[in-house]
Amino acid sequence: MFDIGFSELLLFGVIALIVLGPEKLPQAARTAGQWYAKIRRTVSTLQSEIEAELDLAETRQQMQKELAKIRQTEAEMRREMAEMRGSMQEFESSKNQHLKASRDLVDDAKPRQSSQGSSENDDNRPVSPKSFDYAYDNNRQAEKPESSEQPSAQGDNDSLKTDFNDNANPVIQTITTRPWENMWFRLGAYDKARRLPQPPYLPNYKADILLNSHIDSLLPKQASVNEQESH
């Protein structure tokens, strides 16, 4: 600790022996040793405390650095979240605008279609099928010579023609939903185990010979008992 060698200690001992004498030298050496031990313990304690303080300072610096990194990452995450919220709001606004524009177009197209359909119904009359026209023409050719005798029959045919033309107009119905009748679904392993009951256990007498040997031993006894009862 004090960088003292063996020669210095020997010289110090000789001087102490000359000054103190042989009677007081052991007590002085003991006292010097105690003081030396106390000083060494004090120095080691101070050194350990200084090292602990240095370690504590280093740990504080590291903790401050880590806290700064955490705060930086938190600020970056908040900025990214704000950007994501802004992009989501822009997407929602654009989506709402698109839906509004499509609804406006549909609302504008509905009165046009209704006006066009009404004008077409007023201008165009329904056309009867060719088979009906052919049958009607044949009937009319056959009834030409008898037109003076049967005017009421022609009136009935005209009424039938108008009724058929009225019924010939197709009626379009939009099917929005589909019924769930006659539709089958394939069950998976999980649904089978959950919904279907467990199959009954059927013992295999050929494979489980040792387990079912007592049944084979009971059969002859039961047969002998039955024979005795019959006799």
Swiss-Prot record:
Q: What is its main location?
A: membrane
Q: Name one GO molecular function term.
A: protein transmembrane transporter activity
Q: Where is the composition biased (Basic and acidic residues)?
A: 101-111
Q: Which residues cross the membrane?
A: 1-21
Q: Organism's domain of life?
A: Bacteria
Tell me the compartments it is located in. Cell inner membrane
Per the UniProt entry, what are the Gene Ontology biological process annotations, in alphabetical order?
protein transport by the Tat complex
Q: Where is the composition biased (Polar residues)?
A: 148-157
Name any GO cellular component annotation.
Answer: TAT protein transport complex
Q: Matching InterPro entries, A to Z?
A: TatA/B/E (IPR003369), TatB (IPR018448)
Q: Where is this region: Disordered?
A: 77-168
Q: How does it sit in the membrane?
A: Single-pass membrane protein
Pfam families per UniProt = TatA_B_E (PF02416)
Task: Give the keywords, sorted.
Answer: Cell inner membrane, Cell membrane, Membrane, Protein transport, Translocation, Transmembrane, Transmembrane helix, Transport
Q: How does it assemble?
A: The Tat system comprises two distinct complexes: a TatABC complex, containing multiple copies of TatA, TatB and TatC subunits, and a separate TatA complex, containing only TatA subunits. Substrates initially bind to the TatABC complex, which probably triggers association of the separate TatA complex to form the active translocon.
Report the function annotation for this chain: Part of the twin-arginine translocation (Tat) system that transports large folded proteins containing a characteristic twin-arginine motif in their signal peptide across membranes. Together with TatC, TatB is part of a receptor directly interacting with Tat signal peptides. TatB may form an oligomeric binding site that transiently accommodates folded Tat precursor proteins before their translocation.
Q: Which family does it belong to?
A: Belongs to the TatB family.
User: Which PANTHER family did the record assign?
Assistant: SEC-INDEPENDENT PROTEIN TRANSLOCASE PROTEIN TATA, CHLOROPLASTIC
NCBIfam families, sorted = tatB
Q: What is this protein called?
A: Sec-independent protein translocase protein TatB
